[in-house]
Every structure is written in C-alpha cells, then in structure tokens.
Amino acid sequence: DVFPVRGLVAVYVFITGLYGAVVMCGDEERGLFLPLSYGYRIPCRVASMAAPAIMVSISGLLALWAGGVMTSFPREAAAMAGYCCVVIASAWILRLVCRRPQVLCCIIPFLVIGSLVFCPVFVDAGRFFPGLDQVGRLFPPWYYLQMFR
C-alpha cells in the first residue's frame, strides 16, 4: 500500500521538525537561552524546537481529513502525537550530532529525498527491490506509515 496524502503529511511533519531544530540551533548560537536559569534552558529549547512540528501536525490532521483518508479522529490524533514526539526526538539527536545549524540545513535535502524514496509515500520500493524497505526504517515517516498498513 502507498499513502500519498498520509505520506506527504508524514514527510512534511519530519521536514518541519528538522527546521525547528535548525532554528533552535540558531537561537542557541545567538544566546537566546542564556538569560534563562539552568533548569529552564532544556525545556525551553525543546519547546522552541517542538512548536513548529506540533503546529504542522495539527495542519496535517486537517489535511488527512480534507483528503478523505482519516480513519477515526482519536486514532489519527494519537498516531500523529506519537509520530510528532518521534520527529522531535530524532531532530534533537541530529541537532546534538550536527551542532551547527548550517550542517543540519545541509542534510535536510538528503533526509527528505530518502524519506520520499524509501518510505511508501508514492511507491513501495520494497515490493520491487527486496531490502529497500529495510532502508526505509532509517527514516521516521516509515514508522508512521506502518501504523496504517
């Protein structure tokens, strides 16, 4: 099965989560979080990074509804909330690895292309080339899309 609307929403949320990490890295470089007490810095960083992904997740739910692919709202909302948490966590890890917003910006196109090619957004490449579905497991959209198989 392929999921064009659902797949595009998944990739869009992933891109926005990565964008949130880029913006948060830039805010860190400018010293935005330095005036905060130490106990508030990490929660504020996470909130700053998560805000775009959460807003896009809500818009993604509306796109699923408008596209006529929403199954049941509670199930969709729970799946999207879990997926949003996975996207934020993976963006946080990539931010720790890359450290600079410029480096993170440079890897976003590769992650997007990988998500579109190896996850069943338009074509399930794993059906035609065994093993490619295993590569899809490297990308968060793959897990979200598997919840609706």
Which residues fall in each region the model found?
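Transmembrane helix-loop junction
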Residues: G26, L64-G68, R95-L96, P120, ...
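Hydrophobic alpha-helical transmembrane segments of multi-pass membrane proteins
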Residues: V9, A21, A50, A77-A81, ...
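Transmembrane helix segments
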Residues: P101-L138, W142
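Transmembrane alpha-helix boundary/anchor motif
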Residues: L8, Y12-G20, L61, C85, ...
